[in-house]
Amino acid sequence: YCQKWMWTCDSERKCCEGMVCRLWCKKKLW
């Protein structure tokens, strides 16, 4: 499942974007 704080920018890891688990995510500048 996915949570708002589960952010990972890894091609092999899932990333949470809009409460949806994806296999990719855009790199974000904090």
UniProtKB/Swiss-Prot annotation:
Function: Gating-modifier toxin that targets voltage-gated sodium channels with a selective activity on Nav1.7/SCN9A (IC(50)=1-1.5 nM). It inhibits both activation and inactivation. For inhibition of activation, it is 100-fold more selective for Nav1.7/SCN9A (IC(50)=0.26-3) than for other sodium channels (Nav1.2/SCN2A (IC(50)=40-540 nM), Nav1.3/SCN3A (IC(50)=102 nM), Nav1.4/SCN4A (IC(50)=30-39 nM), Nav1.5/SCN5A (IC(50)=19-90 nM), Nav1.6/SCN8A (IC(50)=26 nM), and Nav1.8/SCN10A (IC(50)=146 nM)).
Keyword Secreted: yes
Keyword Disulfide bond attached: yes
Annotated organism of origin: Thrixopelma pruriens
Record GO terms (molecular function): calcium channel regulator activity; lipid binding; sodium channel regulator activity; toxin activity
Cellular component aspect of the GO annotation: extracellular region
Effect of substituting residue 6 to A: At least 10-fold decrease in affinity with Nav1.5/SCN5A
Sorted UniProt keywords: Calcium channel impairing toxin, Disulfide bond, Ion channel impairing toxin, Knottin, Lipid-binding, Neurotoxin, Pharmaceutical, Secreted, Toxin, Voltage-gated calcium channel impairing toxin, Voltage-gated sodium channel impairing toxin
Cysteine disulfide links: 2-16, 9-21, 15-25
Residue(s) at site: Antagonizes outward gating-charge movement of Nav1.7/SCN9A through direct electrostatic repulsion: 26
Effect upon mutating residue 7 to Q: Important increase in selectivity for Nav1.7/SCN9A; derivative JNJ63955918
Substitution effect: residue 26 to D: Important decrease in ability to inhibit human Nav1.7/SCN9A
Site description Part of an aromatic-rich surface that anchors the toxin toward the membrane core relative to lipid headgroups bound along the pore module of Nav1.7/SCN9A, residues in chain: 5, 7, 24, 30
Tissue: Expressed by the venom gland.
Ranges for region Hydrophobic dyad that anchors the toxin into the membrane while positioning it over the S3 helix of Nav1.7/SCN9A: 29-30
Extra remark beyond the main annotation: The ability to inhibit Nav1.7/SCN9A is greatly enhances by unatural modifications such as C-terminal amidation (5-fold) or C-terminal addition of -NHCH3 (25-fold). Such modifications also improve the ability to inhibit Nav1.2/SCN2A, but the selectivity for Nav1.7/SCN9A over Nav1.2/SCN2A is retained. Highly resistant to proteases, such as pepsin, trypsin, chymotrypsin and elastase. The toxin is not degraded in the plasma and shows fast clearance from the circulation.
Effect recorded for residue 24 to Y: 180-fold decrease in ability to inhibit Nav1.7/SCN9A, and decrease in ability to bind membranes
Name of the protein in its database record: Beta/omega-theraphotoxin-Tp2a
Family that this chain belongs to: Belongs to the neurotoxin 30 (phrixotoxin) family.
Principal location class: secreted
Compartment list: Secreted
Notes concerning its domains: The presence of a 'disulfide through disulfide knot' structurally defines this protein as a knottin.
